[in-house]
Amino acid sequence: MIATRILRRPRVLIVGCGDVGMRCVEQLRRRARPPRIIALTSQPARRAELLAAGAVPIVGDLDRRGTLARLGGLARLVLHLAPPRPSGDGDARTRALIAALGARPAARRGPARQATQAVGRLRATASHLPDGQANRAARIVPEGLRRPMTLVYASTSGVYGDCGGAYVDETRPVRPANARAVRRVSAERQLRRAGARGALDARIVRIPGIYAANRLPIARLERGTPALVDADDVYTNHIHADDLAGILLAAARRGRAGRVVHASDDTEMKMGEYFERVARASGRASPPRITRDEAEQRLEPVQLSFMRESRRLVNTRLKRELRFVLRYPSVEDFLRTVSADSELGSLR
């Protein structure tokens, strides 16, 4: 009885539980039968915050493999939201996570250990039964214990590089144009190889620019950072943070092994237009416009890197395969819910 009760409550491990991860926690907690949520954090000071949100914190650092020993066999669903290190050609963090998840789990104590032992006894008994009875006994073992774990990886649409404003679906070959995107491609390939070995069932979600009330370019507008003139401007793609959390969970539930899905809304606008719409909604001045040549002289390399890539993501898989309904189909839909005299107007 104890084993059945425990095995019926699945565990979800969130690796990299920042803003989007916390939104995933909130959405999981709202389910009629919420899972047990475990959050890996490298910051001991965040334990109280995670507990208050409804997650069990585990302190560990993807840059220190020795701190990850508890992850082996811990959960059947993993949300991998941690970014790569800010340097290097590959993603050592994803490599460390795959190794930790595939390690033999430490002996469980208490009810969890009893559950594992109960399943083991059931399997041992089934091995001595006639074929028909053995098959029926095997079906009693929860399906999650017979399949590899599911891992949903939060990647980036930056892996495509510059596409000249073309419409891009998930079948387009990756052509990363900067070191950040190269590291993301490394992570995706590591997860695909792990999937081919049967170590896990990876679903890859490629994410564009994330926005929310607390993630808008307000500081950029107040600094007066310029945008490109329309003739030189690039198409950008967007997703609200709440929708993104929902998409990650939908990928876990309905996604296909090894499949890529774009987490992008229906917005079709250039970068400068995005800044102008946020400026109007928040009661701030529109950014000045400059040519690309002027931008190359005046802006920082990181800012320029985003201005060198133009693409329009196709989100057909999101709607057809994941059957996901966007809460905010476009940036404009979100901005219409706020005004300059409400929360946006007070942001700094």
What residues fall within each predicted segment?
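NAD(P)H-binding glycine-rich loop region in Rossmannoid oxidoreductase-like domains
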Residues: 42-102, 111-116, 120, 125-132, ...
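Conserved C-terminal active-site "lid" loop/helix of NAD(P)H-dependent oxidoreductases
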Residues: 296-325
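Amphipathic terminal alpha-helices
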Residues: 329-348
